[in-house]
Amino acid sequence: MLSSRAEAAMTAADRAIQRFLRTGAAVRYKVMKNWGVIGGIAAALAAGIYVIWGPITERKKRRKGLVPGLVNLGNTCFMNSLLQGLSACPAFIRWLEEFTSQYSRDQKEPPSHQYLSLTLLHLLKALSCQEVTDDEVLDASCLLDVLRMYRWQISSFEEQDAHELFHVITSSLEDERDRQPRVTHLFDVHSLEQQSEITPKQITCRTRGSPHPTSNHWKSQHPFHGRLTSNMVCKHCEHQSPVRFDTFDSLSLSIPAATWGHPLTLDHCLHHFISSESVRDVVCDNCTKIEAKGTLNGEKVEHQRTTFVKQLKLGKLPQCLCIHLQRLSWSSHGTPLKRHEHVQFNEFLMMDIYKYHLLGHKPSQHNPKLNKNPGPTLELQDGPGAPTPVLNQPGAPKTQIFMNGACSPSLLPTLSAPMPFPLPVVPDYSSSTYLFRLMAVVVHHGDMHSGHFVTYRRSPPSARNPLSTSNQWLWVSDDTVRKASLQEVLSSSAYLLFYERVLSRMQHQSQECKSEE
């Protein structure tokens, strides 16, 4: 029954085709021409509607408790993930607000497309819900446009690295800062010289226009700016060279080889970063002077070359700490490989044992009244109330391998042997002087040739308490945003870690005691 119906349908179709073919070439041409005209008109109408009204899609509104996503412009997940991470750092946004206030004083409507700081501030405030917007997805192409004005050629269709873009942004902000005047206008005394019959009490200073405020070089540094200390100790005479300071915007840590049965931690990476290394064939001026004292008649002595021990420490810790875990490695054949090991990190990070000590400074004695309730309760460091970096380390362990940025002389002969690193089992955050809180994590999925960047970040604080820190975490992948747990964040394979310095409970209580006095 079914086969007979199918045969009948095929026969009817064949008859229609045969009638169309017998109509003649002229009729067939007219029919095909009419269908072509109709198809062209339909395509033109569709194109016109798209140009005038855009794509026919509903603009979604952002769900409550989430942040806006960012549209992927081709391969811009590296930029989107970095912006989401930076927007979770309130200290960086406050610095941008203070830095860009100079433009609002100079002109009523500053062109934001000319300044990286203004463009970045606008994006970060929108991503941190500090600007009123109901859009679920934002466009960050303006950042690429302003970076091109700073002579950075960044394509939105080529895969880039989020860590490299971070340094592009920080270096461009420093260039913008250096273009600003660092001295005030000279006082205009010409009008004072023309007034002859006045008393000294009537003399006042007059200016042409408002003078620029004197710029403090250290105050204008962005919150990610820190300093490393590097010093060298001669293994022969134990002479210590002068300390050298180098700046950094992020700590790029290599991942040491894992030991079977022992997990890798962020503390292991930090210890590997500051661990001492031997530098051979270095001229020691002190050894040369000692050798010259034993010569007769002022004979010239060749420069004495010995082995030095080089030691790194953190001389100035920034307000916002960016840590980069180097996941690039090279095989024996010279091909790049990605390291997928999980590096354990915590929500809070104590940096006391990595801080540089000045010789002769002793740990300060805390008020015994402050030790009654030593708990992990923390207060966010904010503005002028932030503690001034000090040189004592009350939270450092009693047994230390390194002292004052150099190796202890008793350990110099045994530096080649690996030494255990004392890691606290249960860290006491209440006594830490340099304590940091995790704000965002950038994760890279894929290999060294292609992949995708996503971000774990804290949700912005509520409008009722804008100075608080939210405990809600978000997972952001370009324009997709969802809630995440802290356990999911700590289980991720971090590529970039963003920490922000906070006050420990002991420091907060100490400030309260001083204010009461």
Curated annotation (Swiss-Prot):
TM region positions: 36-56
Residues forming the catalytic site: C77, H452
GO cellular component terms, semicolon-separated: cytosol; mitochondrial outer membrane; mitochondrion; nucleus; peroxisomal membrane
One Pfam family from the record: UCH
GO molecular function: cysteine-type deubiquitinase activity; cysteine-type endopeptidase activity; deubiquitinase activity
Compartments, record wording: Mitochondrion outer membrane
EC number: 3.4.19.12
Residues covered by the USP domain: 68-502
Tissue expression profile of the protein: Expressed in skeletal muscle, pancreas, liver and kidney.
Signal sequence, renumbered to the chain: none
Topology feature Cytoplasmic, residues: 57-517
Catalytic activity: Thiol-dependent hydrolysis of ester, thioester, amide, peptide and isopeptide bonds formed by the C-terminal Gly of ubiquitin (a 76-residue protein attached to proteins as an intracellular targeting signal)
InterPro entries membership: Papain-like_cys_pep_sf, Peptidase_C19, Peptidase_C19_UCH, USP_CS, USP_dom
Record-linked PROSITE patterns: USP_1, USP_2, USP_3
Regulation: Inhibited by the diterpenoid derivative 15-oxospiramilactone (S3).
Region (Disordered): 364-395
Cross-link (Glycyl lysine isopeptide (Lys-Gly) (interchain with G-Cter in ubiquitin)): K235, K289
Superkingdom of origin organism: Eukaryota
Post-translational modification: Ubiquitinated by parkin (PRKN) at Lys-235 and Lys-289, leading to its degradation.
Physiological role: Deubiquitinating enzyme tethered to the mitochondrial outer membrane that acts as a key inhibitor of mitophagy by counteracting the action of parkin (PRKN): hydrolyzes ubiquitin attached by parkin on target proteins, such as RHOT1/MIRO1 and TOMM20, thereby blocking parkin's ability to drive mitophagy. Preferentially cleaves 'Lys-6'- and 'Lys-11'-linked polyubiquitin chains, 2 types of linkage that participate in mitophagic signaling. Does not cleave efficiently polyubiquitin phosphorylated at 'Ser-65'.
Protein name: Ubiquitin carboxyl-terminal hydrolase 30
Primary gene name: USP30
